[in-house]
Amino acid sequence: MDIVFLVARILFVLIFISSGLAHFAQRKAMQEYAAAVGAPAPGLGVPLSGLMILVGGLMVLLGIWGDLGALLLFLFVLPVALIMHAFWKQEDPQMRQTEQVMFLKNVSLAGGALAFFWLFVEYGDELPLTITGPLF
């Protein structure tokens, strides 16, 4: 059953690793979108958040201080949900629905990241297929 924990980590972090890479590959477009929705300091925020989710995703995936990695992901997705996907501000019904789905996706990812954080903290040294134990 050890493989189940590894597969769960792979599936969970795919979105963070691919999005983290996109923060750099599509930096200008992401900065423009962040500015359009009113995110603070998109010129700094996009690359920093890209680094945050790329590193956090790799930490969870590899099991290198997975608790810290999961915490980084958690600290990313909640503000992003509130700032980037504020569906309650949308007047167009289709845009409101799209942003609500994205908001709820991020809230769900926050729950998953929090669960991984707890798992790494509580059982870190006993977890299979990890490189290090927890940092916290």
Where on the chain are the PLM-derived regions?
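Extended, low-polarity transmembrane helix blocks
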Residues: 1-29, 40-55, 61-136
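Interfacial loop at the N-terminal end of multi-pass membrane proteins
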Residues: 33-39
